[in-house]
């Protein structure tokens, strides 16, 4: 009788190698390894307790690694896609803030400064600081929502587009509130002056109100700005 080829089966309780998938950071390899472990846990329900714990820990580790890998990929995509928008909006926010600070200082140094005008300017300066922080801190893993949209919901006739713009405006205001709260509570590890000095800053928003599916409002174009100017702040 002809010899039949022997089939090689992996032992049901054999170890599943995960380090190679984790160290590569490849989403495809991570997904495959996750499926392998999930299949093993489902197929072999009577695994030894220690082996089951080992597999479950490996699965959690791989899922976290996959999430990080996808987040890093999205950040790279958005960094390229929204680079120029953020670059021009940062310049605009910086210019406006410097003008407001100058006006405030001039008002303070007058012979008899108006308390009412000082209070008004102080509030405007704070809003200018929030605008600059908004541009710099907006999560790179999410679709960037322009701080200076060229159109408002009231200028649009299409009800679907109008609804999308209103929802986007709500997200924009919500993120500004998050930034203001961080600033008021002193939870930022840098100052607005650090940004104005050109220092690189970073803050991780673990939970943001923005979502990838929101309709973004178009950004207003800056006149007189040179698009070829280099900016390593967002790179």
Curated annotation (Swiss-Prot):
Keywords: Coiled coil, Nucleus, rRNA processing. InterPro entries: Efg1, EFG1_rRNA-proc. Residues 1-31, 210-235 are annotated as: Disordered. It is found in: Nucleus, Nucleolus. Signal peptide: none annotated. Residues 210-224 have a biased composition (Basic and acidic residues). One of its GO terms (cellular component) is preribosome, small subunit precursor. Residues 225-235 have a biased composition (Acidic residues). It comes from the Eukaryota. Residues 25-126, 162-185 form a coiled coil. The keyword rRNA processing applies. GO terms for biological process: maturation of SSU-rRNA from tricistronic rRNA transcript (SSU-rRNA, 5.8S rRNA, LSU-rRNA). It holds the Pfam family Efg1. Belongs to the EFG1 family. Involved in rRNA processing. This is rRNA-processing protein EFG1.
């Amino acid at each position: 009788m002809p010899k039949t080829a022997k089939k090689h089966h992996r032992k049901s309780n054999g170890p599943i190698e995960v380090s190679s998938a984790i160290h590569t950071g490849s989403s495809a390899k991570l997904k495959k390894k996750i499926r392998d472990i999930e299949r093993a846990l489902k197929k072999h329900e009577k695994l030894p307790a220690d082996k089951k714990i080992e597999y479950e820990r490996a699965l959690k580790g791989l899922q976290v690694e996959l999430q990080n890998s996808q987040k890093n990929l999205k950040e790279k995509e958005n960094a390229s896609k929204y680079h120029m928008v953020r670059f021009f909006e940062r310049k605009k926010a910086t210019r406006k803030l410097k003008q407001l600070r100058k006006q405030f200082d001039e008002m303070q140094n007058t012979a008899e400064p108006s308390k009412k005008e000082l209070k008004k300017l102080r509030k405007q300066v704070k809003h200018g600081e929030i605008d600059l922080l908004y541009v710099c801190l907006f999560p790179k893993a999410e679709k960037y929502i322009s701080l200076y949209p060229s159109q408002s919901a009231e200028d649009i006739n299409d009800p679907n587009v109008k609804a999308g713009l209103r929802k986007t405006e709500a997200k924009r205001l919500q993120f500004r509130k998050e930034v203001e709260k961080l600033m008021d509570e002193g939870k930022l590890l840098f100052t607005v002056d650090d940004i104005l000095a050109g220092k690189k800053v970073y803050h991780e928003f673990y939970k943001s109100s923005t979502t990838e599916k929101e309709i973004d409002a178009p950004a207003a174009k800056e006149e007189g700005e040179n698009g070829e100017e280099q900016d390593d702040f967002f790179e």
